[in-house]
Amino acid sequence: MNTPKVNILYSPGQAAQLSRTLISTCHTRPFLLGGLRVATSLHPTQTNLSSSPPRGFTTTSVVRLKDFFPAKETAYIRQTPPAWPHHGWTEEEMISVVPEHRKPETVGDWLAWKLVRICRWGTDIATGIRPEQQVDKNHPTTATSADKPLTEAQWLVRFIFLESIAGVPGMVAGMLRHLHSLRRLKRDNGWIETLLEESYNERMHLLTFMKMCEPGLLMKTLILGAQGVFFNAMFLSYLVSPKITHRFVGYLEEEAVHTYTRCIREIEEGHLPKWSDERFEIPEMAVRYWRMPEGKRTMKDLIYYIRADEAVHRGVNHTLSNLDQKEDPNPFVNDYKEGEGGRRPVNPALKPTGFERAEVIR
């Protein structure tokens, strides 16, 4: 008796990929804005939804929806822990973060501040923010509200673009200080680790938002161009004046705190209903990285965590700009002397304008 011939239509790997795609189509449905594919997961908690599969919103056809960077399965490795584990935040610390501005005192400060304002203007254009959605230009240092709120998709466009660039300064500064330490045959006194950790933290912000959406060709092109220009500009500026560069980054992080504060306000005011929904699920990688407790895993909670991180970068860079760039140790990684005359700086997130040199070095 002849055995019928069986045609293999796909490999085991393709079958696994197909199954993941089918699962994702059962949990999400799409929507599209400016080349950005958004996939926000909701889970049923209400009685009338308990029999239905989780729904969500994206911007492309369902069959194309997939994890933008799925974890690669290996025979032995279960997961890769973060190189710099997050120390975590208390609710009190996160709530106490406020938008603040350090007034320029020198020509270098003024130059750094004006460059940040130009970058803010360019970012508004690149991310499609309309005039009525921009904050009060008469109070650019503290304004966190606008005539018209952004949508969830617009916020994700802005977050992706900003965080793709925000991870550049720390890496550039850390790299140059590493090379400087090798050339001088001297220790760096703790600056390199803090700068690289800052860059890593910004990248984790980006990867978290990337779990919610996938950039299109236009966004990828904008990111490529912006990163190329920004990296080289930071490289040259840090060679010329590290002090002004750190001040620039401090002002840049001020803008980040303003941005996330505005997002929190719009969530609280009900302008972002998808993110206010109790069924909304933030990415699991965010829960693990920030060690977010049960009951504190909403989108607003996630933004609180990220804003606190940005507040740290704000305080750290303003402080580093106040120090002797070649000789002073990094005050945020050193143990301080106890007793009379000894000082221990408070959390940099709570020092918006940074510490003066006399407060941490003497």
From Swiss-Prot:
Function statement: Catalyzes cyanide-resistant oxygen consumption. May increase respiration when the cytochrome respiratory pathway is restricted, or in response to low temperatures.
Pfam families in alphabetical order: AOX
The enzyme's E.C. designation: 1.-.-.-
Protein name as catalogued: Alternative oxidase, mitochondrial
Organism the protein comes from: Gelasinospora sp. (strain S23)
GO biological process: alternative respiration
Primary gene name: aod-1
Keywords: Electron transport, Iron, Membrane, Metal-binding, Mitochondrion, Mitochondrion inner membrane, Oxidoreductase, Respiratory chain, Transit peptide, Transmembrane, Transmembrane helix, Transport
Residues annotated as binding Fe cation 2: 202, 253, 310, 313
UniProt-listed Gene3D superfamilies: Alternative oxidase (1.20.1260.140)
Family the entry assigns: Belongs to the alternative oxidase family.
PANTHER family per the UniProt record, alphabetical: ALTERNATIVE OXIDASE (PTHR31803:SF3)
This protein's record includes keyword Transit peptide: yes
Cofactor binding, per record: Binds 2 iron ions per subunit.
Subcellular location: Mitochondrion inner membrane
Transit peptide, residues from-to: 1-64
Membrane topology designation: Multi-pass membrane protein
Residues given in the record as Fe cation 1 binding sites: 163, 202, 205, 310
Entry keyword Oxidoreductase: yes
Cofactor entry: Fe cation
